[in-house]
Regions:
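Active-site signature of alpha/beta-hydrolase-fold catalytic machinery across serine-
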Residues: 54, 136-140
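A conserved short beta-strand
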Residues: 143-155
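Flexible "cap/lid" loop of the alpha/beta hydrolase fold
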Residues: 79-86, 152-171
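Alpha/beta-hydrolase-fold catalytic nucleophile elbow
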Residues: 71, 125, 149-152, 173
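Gly/Ala-rich beta-loop-alpha elbow adjacent to hydrolase catalytic centers
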Residues: 125-130, 134
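C-terminal catalytic histidine-bearing segment of alpha/beta-hydrolase fold enzymes
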Residues: 171, 183-227
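Short beta-strand/loop motif that positions the catalytic acidic residue
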Residues: 171-174, 178
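Serine-hydrolase catalytic machinery in alpha/beta-hydrolase-like enzymes
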Residues: 15-119
């Protein structure tokens, strides 16, 4: 990178440094005292951990799961200025952000397992931008993933180049009027998975870029089979 000042060229170099920050996550304990599986949620862009957790609690049967909602590290104020929301990453320093996020997820899940009675079963559930994090955590996280729920978000391109990934069962959901996760994007994801002999479950429903009761019921059945 260079800038021109007084007819002279000034060279500017870009660097990165590893920094420590604190992440935030919410836990909804199960209704039972016995060890339970973990359902880990990743919210969409401009949302927060509370928003995603509220959706997870509405899924039938999740009272028998430990619910864990992780908030993205990049916080900012909502347009109204009344709420603190987050995103997972931007295109800037993308590879470093992916590494940081996967390490963050590893630490959160590990901390929860150390302090709560859980089984070995972990399912990652993402909405919108959070879908990419669910896929990445499943593919490269330290904790074995037993299922992925992907609502209204696509598979990150870098994972398509890694044929060594052992994918767990996958449920992909899309609203028929969703203008962000289009039918073409869903078809592209399914085409990729079919090319590696993975056949995700799918749920199409009459709505847009959102959670619905129909989809939550489908997730409930998916989780029942995994548990």
């Amino acid at each position: 990178m260079a800038i021109i000042k007084n007819n002279s060229t000034i060279s500017i170099s870009t660097h990165t440094v590893k920094a420590t920050t604190h992440g935030r996550y919410l836990i909804r304990r199960p209704s039972t005292s016995v060890a339970t599986p973990i359902l880990v949620g990743f919210h969409g862009y401009g949302e927060h951990a509370e928003r995603l957790l509220s959706e997870l609690t509405l899924i039938p049967g999740t009272d028998e799961w430990l619910l864990l909602s992780i908030q993205g590290l990049h916080r900012f104020y909502s347009k109204s200025g009344r709420h603190v929301v987050s995103s997972w990453m931007t295109r800037q320093d993308r590879d470093s952000a992916i590494t940081d996020n996967v390490a963050y997820i590893n630490d959160v899940v590990g901390a929860v397992r150390e302090t709560h009675a859980t089984t070995s079963t972990v399912v990652y559930c993402g909405f919108s931008q959070g879908v990419a994090m669910a896929y990445r955590a499943a593919a490269h996280g330290n904790h074995r993933c037993h299922g992925i729920v992907a609502l209204a978000g696509d598979l990150p391109p870098e994972l398509q180049d890694d044929r060594g990934i052992k994918w767990p069962p996958i449920l992909i959901g899309r609203g028929n009027t969703d203008e962000w996760y289009t039918q073409d994007k869903m078809n592209a994801d399914l085409t990729f998975f079919h090319s590696i002999n993975i056949k995700p479950e799918t749920c199409r429903f009459n709505a847009g870029h959102e959670w619905t009761e129909d989809f939550r019921n489908h997730v409930s059945q998916f989780l029942r089979h995994i548990r």
